[in-house]
């Protein structure tokens, strides 16, 4: 499948960008619906998104470029060209979370409450955006003879984009269910996302052939471990607070 969806005035519009845009739009719709359940206005969601989205893209690109600096130091003109890929999701999430924190402080909003609203939307956006990797023929895995293998350059490989896309979608469904039916404290949905996505990404990353490295270590696996631990700590901390509150 061609990476280029169509051209306008000689400018190629890539499928990668279209899928990311679709993920953002559907994620926004989800966030607005969840926000209404918390009596938070659509304008508040939009105010955060206007800043978080572009900074997330910058963060995702910066993260990727930093760990591929040997290449980009010799090709500086390509640093800002993201039409063909080269966005690292962890960099984007970190930038978006920091942005959300700053805005919440300025607007006197509960930070974890807002993150709980955005996390299901992020998971859905990831599930959709991963298909851009399929079209770009990137982020695939090691050779395999499994029935669902895809063929890249004549070699059957693990469709790791598909593993993560399906995993992200299942995480999205679970987070929405818990948000609507079983949420007990602010930060619950966020910590669930951290644990579930961290586990998913750790194992999927182990199959990929294009991982970013620090020495012999895969960067995303190290980040995944840190995020899982942080998510578990967050869950334990607030569950203890609930137990103490119930005992009073």
Curated annotation (Swiss-Prot):
HAMAP family for this protein: Lgt
Function according to Swiss-Prot or TrEMBL: Catalyzes the transfer of the diacylglyceryl group from phosphatidylglycerol to the sulfhydryl group of the N-terminal cysteine of a prolipoprotein, the first step in the formation of mature lipoproteins.
Taxonomy of the source species: Bacteria, Bacillati, Bacillota, Tissierellia, Tissierellales
Pathway involvement of the protein, from the record: Protein modification; lipoprotein biosynthesis (diacylglyceryl transfer)
PROSITE patterns (alphabetical): LGT
Residues involved in a 1,2-diacyl-sn-glycero-3-phospho-(1'-sn-glycerol) binding: 130
Keywords carried by this UniProt record: Cell membrane, Membrane, Transferase, Transmembrane, Transmembrane helix
Top-level taxon of origin: Bacteria
Name under which the protein is recorded: Phosphatidylglycerol--prolipoprotein diacylglyceryl transferase
Membrane topology value: Multi-pass membrane protein
Species of the source: Finegoldia magna (strain ATCC 29328 / DSM 20472 / WAL 2508)
UniProt subcellular location: Cell membrane
Chain segments annotated as transmembrane: 6-26, 48-68, 84-104, 187-207, 214-234
Alphabetical list of Pfam families matching this protein: LGT
